[in-house]
Amino acid sequence: YEGRNSYTISEAEIRNYFPELMTDYVGTCYGMYFAEVADFYCRENNDEKEMMKLVYQSLRALCAPALPNELVRSIFELKAIVVNGEYPGVPEERKLEESTRYALNYIAESSVEKLYTFTVSDKVLAELSQIASEYRKRFMDRSFKSLEILKTLC
């Protein structure tokens, strides 16, 4: 309900506790990073459904053993930039694998629910990670504590 200067949640029904992440310290750190990025982008009184769906689907993807955490992180970072309206598109001046270009377009254009339906080669993952990192530094003008922890763990 709405208070004088804030909203109060009086009840919630939790449907997914992500029990797989309870024993996965690295996965939990990724989840904390996703929450920290969402906190960076989300503003009170805005419709942030897409960002919340992105965080939820990303946590589900962390629980899928077939998807490398680095791929989940890269997709999350790129899609967060897309959702926020800052995505500059595929870097045309760079020589990239055709599969990387396809993956970047897929991430930008797909619904959040369909994001985590593919895997990529190690080379494509390296290119996606590099581009996501460059875009993160360009559009997210702060450091994230959970990302610093992840860098020491991985």
Label every model-predicted segment.
Residues 1-154:
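Non-catalytic alpha-helical scaffolds and adjoining flexible linkers that form interface surfaces
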